[in-house]
Amino acid sequence: MANQSSTGSAGRFGARYGRVSRRRVSDIEGTMNEDHACPDCGSEAVSREGTGIWQCGKCGYKYAGGAYQPQTPSGKTVTRSIRTALGETGDSNSE
């Protein structure tokens, strides 16, 4: 008898929708259900409330993020750019 592997969250689709689509759904839902750090208190208690809405279970901090991740890669890039711009502006004002 062949070894059985766990199908993950996409096992509910059975043989439908193709292998690649089911794997993508499984990967997305896996990262969505992981523990995420709260940007306010730092605890690993952030959970998804709805599409793009995330809330910390410890401090109750609610914020908007990505649909499947609390912070998207493009959001990280924008935050880094803003910090860099504010850092350069702050240094030039202090001189």
Swiss-Prot record:
MF-aspect GO terms: large ribosomal subunit rRNA binding; structural constituent of ribosome; zinc ion binding
Pfam families: Ribosomal_L37ae (PF01780)
Requisite cofactors: Zn(2+)
Gene Ontology CC: ribonucleoprotein complex; ribosome
Gene Ontology biological-process entries: translation
Keywords, sorted A to Z: Metal-binding, Ribonucleoprotein, Ribosomal protein, RNA-binding, rRNA-binding, Zinc, Zinc-finger
Binding site for Zn(2+): 38, 41, 56, 59
Cofactor-binding details, from the entry: Binds 1 zinc ion per subunit.
Keyword hit for rRNA-binding: yes
Zinc keyword on record: yes
First and last residue of the signal peptide: none
InterPro entries: Ribosomal_eL37/eL43 (IPR011331), Ribosomal_eL43 (IPR002674), Ribosomal_protein_eL43 (IPR050522), Ribosomal_zn-bd (IPR011332)
Zinc finger annotations (C4-type) as residue ranges: 38-59
Subunit structure: Part of the 50S ribosomal subunit.
Sequence similarity: Belongs to the eukaryotic ribosomal protein eL43 family. Putative zinc-binding subfamily.
Free-text function comment from the UniProt entry: Binds to the 23S rRNA.
The name this protein goes by in its record: Large ribosomal subunit protein eL43
Source species: Halobacterium salinarum (strain ATCC 700922 / JCM 11081 / NRC-1)
Name of the gene this protein is made from: rpl37ae
